[in-house]
């Protein structure tokens, strides 16, 4: 597997999945669905953990230029992912004022909560593996997500508990 694929899939896309499943869990009133999501989130967190553990060691062996290239790739993936969460194409297709619609959408609780869930999963892991470099740090700051860099965990990965057998006490 190409390292870009691993960064893109196991850090960025799996982080997106964690955010989506967490949002669904937060907004659902169905206890069975919430229990199912708990298990799915745990499984997704294991995928991210594998990627973090692998990439953390692998990236240490790259040259500064190679690391900066991968850091820029991860940043660009975050920008694309953030942009895909907004529905500019839909607004345009329906003939709505795109700027007004995007401004409205960016202020909704659902959008803000999802963006928070998304970047609190992705940014701490990018930092942990060494992809928040001096070159891209200002770009993440402009994106408004650099505050998450120093979070000790992404909210789903409890490194110690993932080594333990599955605890079903949190389910119904």
Give each language-model segment a name.
Residues 1-6:
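Conserved small/polar residues in nucleotide/adenosyl-binding loops
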Residues 7-14, 26, 30:
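Short capping loops/turns at secondary-structure boundaries
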Residues 10-21, 40-51, 55:
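Alpha-helical transition-metal enzyme core signature, strongest for iron centers
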Residues 21-39, 53-69, 98-102:
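Inter-helical turn/loop segments and adjacent helix faces that build the functional surface
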Residues 64-172:
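Extended, helix-rich structural scaffolds rather than catalytic motifs
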